[in-house]
Structures are given as C-alpha cells and as structure tokens.
Design a protein with these regions (language model features):
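Acidic/polar-rich alpha-helix caps and helix-coil junctions
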Residues: 1-115, 152-153, 157-336
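C-terminal amphipathic alpha-helical segment
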Residues: 118-163
Length: 336
C-alpha cells in the first residue's frame, strides 16, 4: 500500500478515536497505568489525539513537493487554541516498569561521548566557522566551536561557557576535553552535549513525547505555507526570544549580517521557514527523534545516502516469505 494512503488511513483511525473519546463522560480519566502515572482526562485525551492527527497529516511527506501538498488548512484548524495540548504529553520514567525508560535519550544525553551534531548547533554560528566546516572535505571534518548570541548554545561569557541547553565537557580542572573516539573518524566529532535535562533524564522524571512547542511551530509552518507570515511570527518568537534571548524575527526574516540567527548553509541570513525549523530542532532536541528526521527529509536536507523511509522489519518479511530488503546507501529510497 502506498505510504500516503497508509498515512491517510492512520489519520482516519485517530479521528474515529477522537469521536469515541468525546462520547465518554466529562469526568472520564485514563487509568494511571496506561500512560505511567499521568492523569489524563477526556478533553486532554482528545487534544493528545489531535496532536497525533497533526503529525500524521504532516510527517508522511518524503520530499519538499509532498510537504507542500499537506492539507495545511486542516493543520491550522487542528492546532487552533483549545484543540491541542497545553502541557507536555509525557511518561514518568521508572526503571522498574518496562517501556517507560528511554534508551535513545540515554545514548544521546550521555555525558561521556554523546554529542549534539554540528549540523544542529551550526546554524546558530555568526562567525563563519560553520560554513568553513561545511566546505571542508567530509573525511577531514572535526569538532568546531561556534559563536552565537543564542543563549541556549553558549552563555553570555563567551563560547567556552555553557548555554541553557548545551554545554562543553570539561575535566576536574574545568578544562575542555574531547572524549569521542577516533575509531570511526573525526567527522562526527562535536564539542557540544545536551545539558538541559541532566544525565539521568532517560530513567528519572518526565520524558516528553509531545510538546506544545511542536504544535505551535507546526501551526507557524501552516501560516507560512498559506501566505500568512505575520501570523507565524509570534509563534516563532515565543521560544526564540524567551529561551534563546535572540532578537525577534519579523515578516522580513531573522535580521541582517553579521548577527542574524539562524544562517543558511551558504552563510546568508535565514528566512522565517529557517527560523521555524531552527526553533523546532533546538527546543525539541530531546523529544521524539523521528520528528527531526521527518522534517529533514521533507525539506530535502538529509545527507546523501540516508534512508528516506523504513523498510518492513526483517522478521515480518521472513514470516511472509518475502525477500529481505533495505533503504539507504545506494539503494532505492535513499536521499540524493
């Protein structure tokens, strides 16, 4: 079945779930065991389901052309105030309960050799370092240090200080130290690690699955796609100004050189769509990695050879007696 048809089928199933949830008594709440220790009433359940419908409407797209074909009017309708979540939809992590801890968070937030990719941090750079890194032959790339007014990346004290969300590893004397291993090359080397949630976030406390920030920025994208940039501006500025301490964007974009953030890969100032994507990646860095991969493929930004979609699991294929296949590399279904 074509993936677009499957996405539409999934949306219809979720819409049926919304209709059924609305028939429940107003005092209905989900059992605490369903979403570990979360009190979710009927109306909140509907808002969560609406969020998943929005995801289904948007994230199926594999290409820029398909992303443009999304029903953005319906996205606007579903992301209107009152229709989507107003607090994080999360799961309480508990090492004694299977399925509540996050191995992905553990591996991406490790304070030893887990790092934030340079392509995540790089667009914040105003020094030109990131553009020089992009122009460096792939095998010769290594870590870089950016300079940025975005206080989520580094502090006001300069590029060696920690930001609100990212920091640089140091030894007991406070000296920067690189602990990534060279066995796989230095291409993936980065100075930056996530510090927003601490080292035990993957197994302690609330692990967000969906955020109001995601819904607000999808709404901003809908406004941009429908030719209403003025309506997108305040949604982009919510986190940009409050958390990044960056100047607000306007309908004309992110400002002018040399201080604009984010920048495009060629070093020019980003437009509103760039600013929206940048906010989404920085703010939701630890929420559902599939979101960022889906965004990047639909904007044509995946690195060459990356898989564009997931194959059917090998075990399923074996049960069905079908040949094993995959995507990525030079296979069909790979990013050009």
């Amino acid at each position: 079945t074509p993936y677009r048809a499957m996405a539409a089928f999934g949306v219809r199933q979720l819409e049926q779930a919304v209709a059924e949830a609305r028939r429940a008594p107003t005092n209905f709440t989900l059992p605490l065991e369903w979403v570990n220790q979360q009190t979710i009433n009927r109306d909140e359940l509907v808002r969560i389901l609406n969020g998943y419908i929005v995801r289904g409407l948007v994230y199926w797209a594999r290409t820029p052309q398909e992303r443009a074909q999304v029903d953005w009017n319906k996205v606007l309708e579903l992301t209107a105030p009152g229709n989507v979540i107003t607090r994080d939809f999360s799961v309480l992590a508990d090492v004694t309960k299977s399925g509540t801890v996050s191995t992905w968070l553990q591996y991406t937030q490790l304070q030893t050799d887990a790092r934030a990719d340079n392509m995540l941090i790089g667009p914040s750079d105003t020094s030109g370092t990131y553009q020089r890194w992009l122009q460096t032959p792939f095998e010769q790339r290594t870590e870089i240090q950016v300079r940025t007014p975005d206080r989520r990346i580094h502090g006001a004290g300069g590029p060696n200080t920690n930001g609100k969300y990212f920091g640089q590893p140091t030894d007991a004397r406070g000296t920067y130290v690189q602990t990534m291993r060279t066995g796989r090359g230095t291409t993936i080397f980065s100075r930056y690690r996530g510090i927003r949630y601490g080292t035990q976030h993957f197994q302690i406390g609330q692990i967000p699955v969906m955020s109001p920030v995601e819904m607000a920025l999808l709404r901003a994208e809908a406004f941009l796609r429908l030719g209403r940039p003025a309506d997108a501006v305040p949604l982009i500025n919510r986190t940009r100004v409050a958390n990044g301490e960056l100047p607000p964007v306007t309908v004309n974009g992110t400002g002018s050189l040399p201080a604009c953030v984010p920048r495009k890969d060629d070093g020019s100032c980003g437009d509103l769509m760039d600013a929206m994507l940048y906010e989404k990646r920085i703010e939701l860095q630890s929420v559902e990695p599939i979101l960022h991969w889906a965004d990047w493929r639909a904007f044509g930004k995946l690195q060459r050879g990356s898989m564009m979609q997931f194959p059917i699991h090998g075990r399923e294929l074996q049960v069905l007696g079908l040949p094993i296949y995959t995507f990525g590399g030079s296979n069909p279904g790979s990013a050009p």
